[in-house]
């Protein structure tokens, strides 16, 4: 599937207007039918955020615009979090193409960088605040191997649940270079994009739980 591109005018970033605000606030509207009793709110950036049950598990979905990295095009990150506790020792963050400018993540605060096991995607860096062995490595590596690494930015396994950070849109290169047009989110996110990400997190969470279960016999 082709990545969504911005279609705003050359000075859209200077004149937000009602249409831009409405598009951002309604960016997740097409995804609402996926959830049971969803709670929709608008974040400080103006983009929608959803919390609700999906297939019996609690999810939080938010959208984060990113225009701080001067070497990259402005983009939108989709943060999808399955908020169900896990019996793990700490937070395990696998970051793709780390730049140090990932303001949406606690990756930069984690002090313990671990060797990347065989089978993980190229360009992956792993950090944790836990000590000793990290038993989720095989599960995490298998999960990441099934994803489009060009869009994948981060996967987190933590006591509070699991998260994937996904690239859903970036600014049109020509417009941005010529006019600095960085308008994003004009087209709403579809359920066809979000549902597979949530399904994948359900599987990842279940696999981590299974790996943490006591072994008998």
Name each model feature, range by range.
Residues 2, 13-26:
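Active-site acidic/histidine clusters and adjacent loop/turn architecture
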Residues 3-11, 40-55, 60, 68-217:
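Charged, low-complexity intrinsically disordered regions
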């Amino acid at each position: 599937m082709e990545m969504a591109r911005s279609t705003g005018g050359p000075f859209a970033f200077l004149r937000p207007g009602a249409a831009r605000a409405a598009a951002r606030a309604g960016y997740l509207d097409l995804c609402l039918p996926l959830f049971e009793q969803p709670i929709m709110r608008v974040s400080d950036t103006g983009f929608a955020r959803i919390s609700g049950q999906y297939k019996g598990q609690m999810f939080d979905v938010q959208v984060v615009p990113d225009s701080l990295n001067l070497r990259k095009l402005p983009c939108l990150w989709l943060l999808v979090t399955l908020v169900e506790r896990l019996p793990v020792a700490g937070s395990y963050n696998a970051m793709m193409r780390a730049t140090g400018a990932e303001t949406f993540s606690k990756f930069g605060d984690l002090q313990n960088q671990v060797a990347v096991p065989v089978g993980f995607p190229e360009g992956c860096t792993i950090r944790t605040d836990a000590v000793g062995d990290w038993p989720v490595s095989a599960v995490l590596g298998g999960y990441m191997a099934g994803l489009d690494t060009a869009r994948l930015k981060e996967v987190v396994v933590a006591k509070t649940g699991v998260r994937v950070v996904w690239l859903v849109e970036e600014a049109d290169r020509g417009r941005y270079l010529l006019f600095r047009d960085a308008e994003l989110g004009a087209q709403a996110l579809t359920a066809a994009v979000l549902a597979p990400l949530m399904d994948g997190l359900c599987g990842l969470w279940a696999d981590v739980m299974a790996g943490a279960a006591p072994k008998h016999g």
